[in-house]
Amino acid sequence: MNQFVHEDLPCGIELGVLPLPRRHVVGFQIRVLAGVSAEPPDKLGLASLVEDTLDKGTEKRTGQQLLDAFDAIGAGVNSGTGRETTTFTCTVLPEHFEKAVELHAELLRTPTFPQDAFDVNVDLARQEIEGLEDDPQALVDKYISRRAYGPILGRHTLGEKQTLAKITRADALDHWRQNFTAGRMIVSVAGALDPRRAADVFQRHFDGFGSTRRDGRAPISVEFAPGVSHHPKALEQEQIGICFPGVDADHPEFPTQQVILGILSGGMSCRLFTEVREKRGLVYWVAAWQETPRGAGMIFLGASTTPQRCDETFATLLREVDRLSEDIEQTELERAITGIVAQQDTRGDSTRSKCSELANDLFFYGRPVPPEEKTAKITAVTVEMIRAYLAGHPRDRLCVVTLGPRPLSGSPALTRHRGMEVSPQS
């Protein structure tokens, strides 16, 4: 069994460490609890611009010198902006661990936000927004997120063209000063490293970094807005997105929700692939997945079909979810559970993955969760639990977004759901 260490450092950092002494690598992840939800409503895209510009120069180094310093120790680094967090990840040899932390402290604590680099990033973000027009699936994701989560959590990380035009370097500095503090940081470490040394290194390099107050941990309210919206676009295919409320990652029914999604969309023998694509030939692609911001959970169904078959595809997607409570078989349940457990044991076996999983545990549960505990909850799911979940979470309030030549026609599959008022075409 893994021996996790979890503590709050005097500097304000919440730290989790998973020692893996047989591996000659260390991975760490720094999550700053400020993502797009922390942006002013008229400056959407700001959080991503800050993340993209942090490593373009510090008080000590230029952006190129900073990259050279990471390369000199063979560190693999990455960063990203999400709804609730801005994340920085690193994998490095144990002997270079402290240097890697030192470099991250430098870019997080003393960025200079060079004007030329900032301007380039604004232009790149604008180009990426324009590029969404050539990615129908990404466009549907953007549109449905607004309806599923509301004006705060439903923001797109890139922002909008009109808000990007208002963002200045001074805005980036203000966002960094207000949100980048040790008290807003969750740090996970996994690999060949003594937990005490990990704590000492992070304490030393982040001591005095802003407030130690544990900010950014309260869930942000979701504003779910059921309804149907169509976005006309000259495409050969029709994109369909469906969303309905599920449960959050800390809910007792979360393992049941995971297994349901495994039955629907977990592998080549899953229901959606078999019934919607293989047997009926309705779709080019089809999937079901979940998203779980803190305190909320959403289930999504997505498909790409022909405009002529969009109504049939929509009805079939919902029918396959409903049908689970009628004819689920024990062998089907066991296959889904085996797939989930195998995925946890194989894809999650790399040091980087274990580090990311530990960060997720701290973020969602406030503690490290042993893999054995997660596996036990998955394997305990029964057919009766799945039926109870589906009965307790009816699909009677849906967000539906279509993108393509024609809207849904208002078939019985659409109108039988409460709150399904059709919005004007966008």
Language-model features, listed with the residues they occupy:
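Short, hydrophobic/aromatic-rich segments at coil-to-beta transitions
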Residues: 1-4, 225-227
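Charge-rich, well-structured scaffold segments of protease-associated domains
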Residues: 4, 8, 16, 65-214, ...
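His/Glu-based metal-binding/catalytic segments typifying zinc-dependent metallopeptidases
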Residues: 13, 18-34, 44, 213-270, ...
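Catalytic and substrate-binding regions of extracellular carbohydrate-active enzymes
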Residues: 38
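Active-site SXXK
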Residues: 45-56
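Phosphate-proximal small/polar/acidic motifs at interfaces that engage nucleotide phosphates
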Residues: 273-274
